[in-house]
């Protein structure tokens, strides 16, 4: 369940060696100086501001969430005066209803420039389709926050140009000091011992500034994967025990500062195999409800995000053997067991679930806690509000499929033993860097298929 800033310096500048670009070649995007015309039978399709591609007989498309009957109320943005005086979008009900989600340009560029060149021709159209699926942008280092502004500006421009339905921004806030306290693969940039709490608050302030600047852009945030769940089950780990007060202070600060009219937030809540056990449900609900009330019951905190970067099913008729007797063996059972406890404690929460890598069920995990680059997985259900459960706001893609969970190199400083298990695909690169074999696995096993 790991994600870390990639060290790969992506470049979208490819050599112009012919007047017309071949099928699947790049034909446009910011900074592109090569061919802009495609060979006969292909059309130059703009996938994002940074990348256009020659696709056979295709035109650019946007992915729209199919919506439920829950209504979304917005104030229409004006077409003048961008930036600090932008009109404010306000939301009520399901924050996904009535919006299409933003396709992550960075992930799209990874797919097109890293994955597709080495894929067999039969998989290239499928990979191109994956690049168009909206996935969350991870703000896993402070240096990425300005890029958030770039994306919000792009969304603002598209919405003013008449995007219908309007586009919502989707981001993961993920930079706690002493991050990933119970594992090693995704340790972050801040240390509690080295001014980490103050640095984190500055990071949150920078995110808030972007959200205020683009107050006419509806934005959905997932807050700190793997943080509060560790405070439920892993306080026996010294690093987690030492981080407890800092985690709570930092998450409280984030919830208060990002409680804005144009924002909807979901706190990370692990998954069924972590907090869904009967012994963990009560303590988890108590913690989440206390965090909610301590932050002043922020209106923007819609609920909890589950299965982030994990592989669990939404609903199973039979519990797999690796769930080891947990009655809440899928995410639907988990949230329906958790929700009443939260409500009784004053937090009327709704949920979202990451389905980016849960297309194959049952999984090939040897144990339910095996989280690193699990073999045999596939892309799952595309983003949708058609969940069939009033507690579940949406299925979404939070983890960018194809980015590694962690390295299998045991000599690495960030090596975690889970990444060397027999059910982890190997050899694997560092967390957050591109893992071509894993992307191909997800693509080949996608359910529904591309």
Swiss-Prot record:
Nucleotidyltransferase as UniProt keyword: no
Region feature Catalytic, mapped onto this chain: 91-450
Keywords: Carbohydrate metabolism, Cellulose degradation, Disulfide bond, Glycoprotein, Glycosidase, Hydrolase, Polysaccharide degradation, Secreted, Signal
Predominant localisation class: secreted
MF (Gene Ontology): cellulose 1,4-beta-cellobiosidase activity; cellulose binding
Biological process according to GO: cellulose catabolic process
Disulphide bond pairs: 27-44, 38-54, 181-240, 372-419
Active site: 180, 226 (proton donor), 405 (nucleophile)
Glycan-linked positions: 409
GO terms under cellular component: extracellular region
Domain (CBM1): residue spans on this chain: 20-55
Catalytic function, reaction form: Hydrolysis of (1->4)-beta-D-glucosidic linkages in cellulose and cellotetraose, releasing cellobiose from the non-reducing ends of the chains
Transmembrane domains' residue ranges: none
Region named Thr-rich linker: 59-90
Signal peptide from the UniProt entry: 1-19
Family: Belongs to the glycosyl hydrolase 6 (cellulase B) family.
UniProt cross-references to PANTHER family, sorted A to Z: 1,4-BETA-D-GLUCAN CELLOBIOHYDROLASE C-RELATED, PTHR34876
Entry's free-text remark on domains: Has a modular structure: a carbohydrate-binding module (CBM) at the N-terminus, a linker rich in threonines, and a C-terminal exocellobiohydrolase catalytic module. The genes for catalytic modules and CBMs seem to have evolved separately and have been linked by gene fusion.
UniProt protein name: Probable 1,4-beta-D-glucan cellobiohydrolase C
């Amino acid at each position: 369940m790991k994600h870390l800033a990639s060290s790969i310096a992506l470049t979208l500048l490819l050599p112009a060696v012919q007047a017309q670009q071949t099928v699947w070649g790049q034909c446009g995007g910011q900074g592109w100086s090569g061919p802009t015309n495609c060979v006969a039978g292909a059309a130059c399709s703009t996938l994002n501001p940074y990348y256009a591609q020659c696709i056979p007989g295709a035109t650019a498309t946007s992915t729209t969430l199919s919506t439920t009957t829950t209504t979304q109320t917005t104030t229409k943005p004006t077409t003048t005066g961008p930036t600090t005086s932008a009109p404010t979008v306000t939301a009520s009900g399901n924050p996904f209803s009535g919006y299409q989600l933003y396709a992550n340009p960075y992930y799209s560029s990874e797919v097109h420039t890293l994955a597709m060149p080495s894929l067999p021709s039969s998989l290239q159209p499928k990979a191109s389709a994956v690049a168009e699926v909206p996935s969350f942008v991870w703000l896993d280092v402070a240096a990425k926050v300005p890029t958030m502004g770039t994306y919000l500006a792009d969304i603002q421009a598209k919405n003013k140009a008449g995007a219908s339905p309007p586009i919502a921004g989707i981001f993961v806030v993920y930079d706690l000091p002493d991050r990933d306290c119970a594992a090693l693969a995704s340790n972050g940039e801040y240390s509690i011992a080295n001014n980490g709490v103050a640095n984190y608050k500055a990071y949150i302030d920078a995110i808030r500034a972007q959200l205020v600047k683009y107050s006419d852009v509806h934005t959905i945030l997932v807050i700190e994967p793997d943080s509060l769940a560790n405070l439920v089950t892993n306080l026996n780990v010294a690093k987690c025990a030492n981080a407890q007060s800092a985690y709570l202070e930092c998450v409280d600060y984030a919830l208060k500062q990002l409680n804005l009219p144009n924002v909807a937030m979901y706190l990370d809540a692990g998954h069924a195999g972590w907090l869904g056990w009967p012994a963990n449900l009560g303590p988890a609900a108590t913690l989440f409800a206390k965090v909610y009330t301590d932050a002043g019951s922020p209106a923007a905190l819609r609920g909890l995000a589950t299965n982030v970067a994990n592989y669990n099913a939404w609903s199973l008729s039979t519990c797999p053997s690796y769930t080891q007797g947990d009655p809440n063996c899928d995410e639907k059972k988990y949230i329906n067991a958790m929700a009443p406890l939260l409500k009784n404690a004053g937090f009327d929460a709704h949920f979202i679930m990451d389905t980016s890598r849960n297309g194959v069920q049952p999984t090939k995990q040897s144990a339910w806690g095996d989280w690193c680059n699990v073999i045999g997985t596939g892309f799952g259900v595309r983003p949708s509000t058609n969940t069939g459960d009033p507690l579940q706001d949406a299925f979404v893609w939070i983890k960018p499929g194809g980015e590694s969970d962690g390295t299998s190199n045991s000599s690495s400083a960030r090596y975690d033993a889970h990444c060397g298990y027999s059910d982890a695909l190997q050899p694997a690169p560092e967390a957050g860097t591109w893992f071509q074999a894993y992307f191909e696995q997800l693509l080949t096993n996608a359910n529904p298929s591309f």
